[in-house]
From Swiss-Prot:
Residues reported in the UniProt entry to bind heme b b566: H95, H194
One GO MF term: metal ion binding
Cell compartments where the protein resides: Mitochondrion inner membrane
Topology term for the membrane: Multi-pass membrane protein
Protein name: Cytochrome b
Gene Ontology CC terms, in alphabetical order: mitochondrial inner membrane
Lineage of origin: Eukaryota, Metazoa, Chordata, Craniata, Vertebrata
Length: 214
């Protein structure tokens, strides 16, 4: 029983905790909200990292070392961004596993929009991995982008276009930084569509419990 008369005098977080939710929704339904929280953390920390980052092959690694050592609380921003990225993928894989288990793929529009979100997220993570321009960043950029050459007829042209030349160089890093910056905002837009499609048909009873239990 919720006493709505006293709700206005309570703390905001307490109000959220008191929001009525059906008993047929379990802990597995938390991960969509956690993904949104991860996205917000990534955008906020990423903004502060972008302020100090230099998209140049000669300065990129040094700018990150400067961020870690010289910028006040820069190391917190960098580590939070990295750890939250890992948490992002843990949450999304659990979110997808929940969808497989409860047959959410039958809702085709929601499932396909979610699949698109996963692909965009993986691309964003790849572009971010390249940005420090360390040895592994260079290797990743070379190997992954070279996969485009497997496309018949257009492969070599597409790879050259993506690199901004005939080899991975400064233009590659610049456009990867631009893509890494813009894609999270596309993810926000796609997430909104994902949620709209989810609520388009109304709710269901995935756990199969008594709908009158509450």
């Amino acid at each position: 029983y919720i006493n709505y008369k006293n709700m206005s005098h309570q703390h905001l977080l307490t109000l959220f905790n008191l929001l009525p939710v059906g008993s047929n929704i379990s802990t597995w339904w938390n991960f969509g909200s956690m993904l949104l929280a991860c996205l917000m953390i990534q955008i906020i920390t990423g903004f502060f990292l972008a302020i100090h980052y230099t998209a140049n092959i000669n300065l990129a690694f040094s700018s990150i070392i400067h961020l870690s050592r010289d910028v006040p609380y820069g190391w917190i921003m960098q580590n939070t961004h990295a750890i939250s990225a890992s948490l992002f993928f843990i949450c999304i894989y659990i979110h997808i596993a929940r969808g497989f288990y409860y047959g959410s793929y039958l809702n085709k529009e929601v499932w396909l929009s979610g699949t698109t979100l996963l692909i965009i997220l993986m691309a964003t993570a790849f572009f971010g991995y390249v940005l420090p321009w360390g040895q592994m960043s260079f290797w990743a950029a070379t190997v992954i982008t070279n996969l485009l050459t497997a496309i018949p007829y257009l492969g070599t042209t597409l790879t050259t276009w993506l690199w901004g030349g005939f080899a991975i160089n400064d233009p590659t890093l610049t456009r990867f930084f631009a893509l890494h910056f813009i894609l999270p905002f596309i993810i926000i837009s796609m997430s909104s569509i994902h949620i709209l499609l989810l609520h388009n048909e109304g709710s269901n009873n995935p756990l199969g419990t008594n709908s009158d239990i509450d």
